[in-house]
């Protein structure tokens, strides 16, 4: 159903790490991606019933983490510290072999 809307995007922030990632048009952010430091993050969506105030969606937090984090530990800390809208299961891996599964 969403396959026609998947787009591969190359990100080249001025002050950050380059990344390749999939996005679902027209949603902002990254669903799955890997940056130049070999940090990889993938999202499995989850149904959420929370009624929270509008915040950045999870995919925006993933894109931001890929641009600014080199390790799983950095990415988990950054993503968990920020308010967000939505839920999901994140899988993260980095060049050192560190792995994490995070439920949002």
Residue ranges and their predicted role:
Residues 1-104:
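N-terminal nucleophile
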């Amino acid at each position: 159903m969403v396959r026609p809307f998947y787009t591969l995007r190359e990100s080249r922030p001025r002050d950050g790490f380059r990344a390749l990632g999939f996005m679902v048009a027209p949603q902002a952010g990254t669903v799955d991606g890997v940056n130049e430091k070999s940090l990889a993050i993938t999202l499995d969506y989850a149904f959420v019933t929370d009624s929270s105030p509008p915040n950045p969606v999870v995919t925006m937090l993933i894109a931001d983490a890929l641009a600014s984090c080199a390790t799983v530990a950095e990415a988990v800390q950054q993503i968990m510290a920020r308010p967000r809208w939505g839920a999901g299961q994140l899988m993260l891996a980095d060049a050192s072999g560190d792995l994490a599964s995070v439920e949002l």
